[in-house]
């Protein structure tokens, strides 16, 4: 009997902040980046690094998307204070998270999910709508 591969043990990606299922990533409009991504209904943004080797670029892209495209603002955000993040191994063909190991895995894509933490002094607003 064949053992299941890591890919088959994956699970459909869900937002860790609201629990909703994440849509399939697609080409993001309004950005020159080729990295696919999308946005959750709660305002969290994610970008997929298909090679698993451009993590810094993917995280910066996700932060810029979360800031509405304001790259200057996104460069000064600090994890834990300004945003929450989740980095997970991802299979783009099956649209599944691949659990069971951490770190770089040759040929495995990575999904970078970011949600901004509202500042305590800011008025409570609804989720940021996706860019048009």
Where are these regions (language model features)?
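Residue-level signal for mature regions of secreted extracellular proteins and peptides
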Residues: 8-11, 33-35
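Short cysteine-rich clusters marking metal-coordination/redox-active sites
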Residues: 15-19, 39-40
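Cys/His-rich microdomains that often coordinate metals
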Residues: 19-24, 44-47
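Short linker/helix segments within small regulatory modules
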Residues: 26-37
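Short metal-binding segments enriched for Cys and/or His
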Residues: 41-61, 67-72
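Long, contiguous alpha-helical scaffold regions
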Residues: 70-132
């Amino acid at each position: 009997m064949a053992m299941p591969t890591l890919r088959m043990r994956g699970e459909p990606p869900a937002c860790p902040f609201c629990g909703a299922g994440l849509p399939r990533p697609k080409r993001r409009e309004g950005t020159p980046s080729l990295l696919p991504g999308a946005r959750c209904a709660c305002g969290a943004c994610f970008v997929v690094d298909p090679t698993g080797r451009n993590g810094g670029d993917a995280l910066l892209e996700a932060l810029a998307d979360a800031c509405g495209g304001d790259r200057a603002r996104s460069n000064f955000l600090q994890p834990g204070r300004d945003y929450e993040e989740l980095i997970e191994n991802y299979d783009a063909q099956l649209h599944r998270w691949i659990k069971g190991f951490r770190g770089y895995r040759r040929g495995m894509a990575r999904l970078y999910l970011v949600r901004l933490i509202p500042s305590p002094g800011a008025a409570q607003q609804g989720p940021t709508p996706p860019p048009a």
